[in-house]
Amino acid sequence: MKLTREEKRIKRHRRIRKKISGTASRPRLCMYRSLNAFYASLVDDITGNAILTVSSLGKEYVDATGKRGGKSIEAVQKVAEILVQKAKEKGIDKAVFDRSGYLYHGKVKAFAEKCRELGLIN
């Protein structure tokens, strides 16, 4: 039986998660792409808590751009800027990037490069 695109992504994500883990001092930066929005979270895997979550549906994004639910590359980069700013406020200066099984291309690549440019990930 042939796997669907989402099943393939989940399979890749599980394989990646075996190797990547976040701590309180260096949390895991995971992301999710839906059809209408982009979500990013900093997660402490030891306690299982999300330290910080930002999305293109959130109040900070709407205040900064004036629109709700962007899914373009520019919207993803704005979400990255907001995430890095809030992380710095919480005292988090480094994170481990988890692409969540998505291919490193397009929006995922733009998000990672923006976070890297702003100094959150190596």
From Swiss-Prot:
Keywords: Ribonucleoprotein, Ribosomal protein, RNA-binding, rRNA-binding. This is Large ribosomal subunit protein uL18. One of its GO terms (biological process) is translation. Belongs to the universal ribosomal protein uL18 family. This is one of the proteins that bind and probably mediate the attachment of the 5S RNA into the large ribosomal subunit, where it forms part of the central protuberance. NCBIfam families: L18_bact. It comes from Hydrogenobaculum sp. (strain Y04AAS1). One of its GO terms (cellular component) is cytosolic large ribosomal subunit. The keyword Iron does not apply. One of its GO terms (molecular function) is structural constituent of ribosome. Part of the 50S ribosomal subunit; part of the 5S rRNA/L5/L18/L25 subcomplex. Contacts the 5S and 23S rRNAs. It comes from the Bacteria.
